[in-house]
Amino acid sequence: MPKKTTKIDTRVPKFIVFMGQFLYRISPFLAEKFARKLFITPIKHKIPKREFQMEAESIQTKLFVPSINKEIVVYAYGNSTKKILLVHGWSGRGTQLVKIADAVLKNGYSTISFDAPAHGKSGTKTTLMLEFIESILAVEKQYGPFEFAIGHSLGGMSILNAIKKGLQVKKAVVIGSGNSVVNIVNTFVEKIGLPHKVAVLMRNSFEKKYQFDMESFSAYVAAKDVTIPVLVFHDTDDEDIPVSEAHHLAENLSNKEVIITNNLGHRKILGDASVINRIVEFLLIKK
C-alpha cells in the first residue's frame, strides 16, 4: 500500500514546517507543544485602506471580559439604536466586515464589533474560540441588545455557540464558517506538515487543560439548539474551510437558508456586492 502523503499548505512558512518536523523526530510531544502554540496564536495584520473610514469613525472603547480576565477593544459604528453585532474570524479584526457594516448603516442600522482577544488592538498574544464566545456575551451585556448577528469564519462558529449560551438575536448570518473543531485541528496539523498523531495529542492537551470535549464547540453541535433563521454563506473555492462543512452545518439547523458561491474564496466573499445584497435582504427585508 502506498504511503499517505501529507498535504502541506504552501502558504505556511518553510521554517515552521521544518521546525515542526525536526521536533517530531525528537519527540511527538515536543511537536505537539509547538503546534498547539501556533494554533492559538493569530497573525496580526495591518488595517487595509478600505477599513480606514470605519476605524476612524467608530467610537472605540475598551471592555474587560471578567470570565476570561482579558480586555478587548469594541467598535461602535453608526448612530442608530437598532444594532447589529459583527464578529470577525481568526487573524481578523473588528473592522474587517466593513463592506457589510456600510451596507447596513445605509439601511438605518448601526454596528457593534470588536477585536477578539489577541486580535487587532486587543491585548495578549494567544486565544481560542471559548474566548470569542465569552467576548460576544460580554459585548451583548454592555452594548446590546442586538437585532441580528453576522460572523465570518471562527466568528460564525462563535455566534452559533453564543446563541446556544443565551445571545438574543432575531436572525444570524454565518459566512465561511468553520464547523467541526476536530476537523479544524486535523486540517491545521496536516497543513503544517505533521502526522495525524500530533492532532490527537493536541486534542488531548486542550481537553485536559480546559476540561471540555472540543467537538462540543463545533458549529453543527451548537446549531441543534439554534431555532432562529440563519443564513449560511460558503464559497466552493474556500481555501481554508471546505464547502462540505457548510452542508454539514446546515443539516443541523432547523431554520436556514444556504447560499453557495463560486470564485470568492474565504475572504473576498466579505466584500462581494451580491453577497452583501443578499445579507441585507435576508436581515432587513425578508420577513
Label each PLM-derived region with a short phrase.
Residues 6-64:
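An N-terminal hydrophobic leader/cap segment in hydrolases
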Residues 94, 101-123:
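Conserved alpha/beta-hydrolase
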Residues 150-159:
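Gly/Ala-rich beta-loop-alpha elbow adjacent to hydrolase catalytic centers
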Residues 164-212:
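Hydrolase active-site cap/lid region
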Residues 219, 228, 242-249:
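Short alpha-helix in the alpha/beta-hydrolase fold that links the catalytic acid
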Residues 225-227, 232-234, 238:
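Short beta-strand/loop motif that positions the catalytic acidic residue
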